[in-house]
Amino acid sequence: MAATIVSVKARQIFDSRGNPTVEVDVCCSDGTFARAAVPSGASTGVYEALELRDGGSDYLGKGVSKAVDNVNSVIAPALIGKDPTSQAELDNFMVQQLDGTKNEWGWCKQKLGANAILAVSLAICKAGAIIKKIPLYQHIANLAGNKQLVLPVPAFNVINGGSHAGNKLAMQEFMILPTGAASFKEAMKMGVEVYHNLKSVIKKKYGQDATNVGDEGGFAPNIQENKEGLELLKTAIEKAGYTGKVVIGMDVAASEFYNDKDKTYDLNFKEENNDGSQKISGDSLKNVYKSFVSEYPIVSIEDPFDQDDWEHYAKMTAEIGEQVQIVGDDLLVTNPTRVAKAIQEKSCNALLLKVNQIGSVTESIEAVKMSKRAGWGVMTSHRSGETEDTFIADLAVGLATGQIKTGAPCRSERLAKYNQLLRIEEELGAAAVYAGAKFRAPVEPY
């Protein structure tokens, strides 16, 4: 007799920013117990599936009691007696039948909330792995039909700007990727050493308080020029002795400083007395990136333009997409419909995989498979509001995404994922493969 679900219980817990989020426990007839919690983002794309919040004055409107109630009163009774190893069936049942809301980009989870559905989807996935007596990463690989497990290159967000930081920096994340490491363990060593070198460089140049950390564990020194951020990384990499082995990635989050009225980008958007003198066109911004790429070892640029600026995405991908990965986050929001459009229009060449943007494990797998078949790279990602849940570490290995960004090597909700990857690499032993320089295409499409 196959194990079946006997209970599904949701509760409100807190993320790393002190905001409420949803956690779900699933119990099965064979005694299996699994628990999962969902994250939430600060710079959210307008096309993301609905994250249901309560509104009102409690928790400044960010409570999730409605989402919790939706799990406990709508989803839970409907899942009792079902087989937790049937991931796609249960995800589709929740998304299409229990929720059933759609917009032009597909199933939008407006009724129950993507945070409610995803928490259950993640917990079911963990339960399925336990029932099958296999590691979670292997269960995910099996669900996707992937034969080759790969440890991802970590992209450590070590300098914060944009909506994540109180400084004047327009661009949101400056990352280091240890592509020259031979294993994930060595990648962690390189990342940590560059991080500590960066800390001392910043402290010396900007003073003690410049090494306070942001939401994702990176530093937010009060620098204004984006180029200065790149210069700091270059110096820290040199000081650590990893020039050529550690490269640079950026997440610009350009939607945050795009002006839809005059179609310009304002690199001075955080300045109180902003006179608009720093506003530039999409073409000018593209040239800024090209100059960065010619001067620094940049291998990845995420969200270089607004989430609706398909035109400049395509131009940039055509011009520098060979040497640099152009990653769609707000552009794609892990949505298979938007991924299909971007593939057709050659808008970018990599997917940022955030499970809570789409709201189920099955739809996330679909977006990854589509991306890989198009020859794209895939970067698994956390959100700025995280929990101690480590699901995305197993997800990155199981789907062989080749890359993961889950913050700096600082703050326990970030290290939880990196530490889980260390355990997975150890468990795989001689079979462990680190993506390294092949981070954009670590395996054949599946």
Curated annotation (Swiss-Prot):
Substrate binds at residues 164, 173, 302, 329, 381-384, 405. Mg(2+) binds at residues 251, 302, 329. It is found in: Cytoplasm. GO terms for molecular function: magnesium ion binding; phosphopyruvate hydratase activity. It is an enzyme of class 4 (lyase). Its EC number is 4.2.1.11. SUPFAM superfamilies: Enolase C-terminal domain-like, Enolase N-terminal domain-like. The keyword Magnesium applies. InterPro entries: Enolase, Enolase-like_C_sf, Enolase-like_N, Enolase_C, Enolase_CS, Enolase_N. The active site is at residues 216, 354. PANTHER family: ENOLASE (PTHR11902:SF50). NCBIfam families: eno. This is Enolase. The lineage of its organism: Eukaryota, Viridiplantae, Streptophyta, Embryophyta, Tracheophyta.
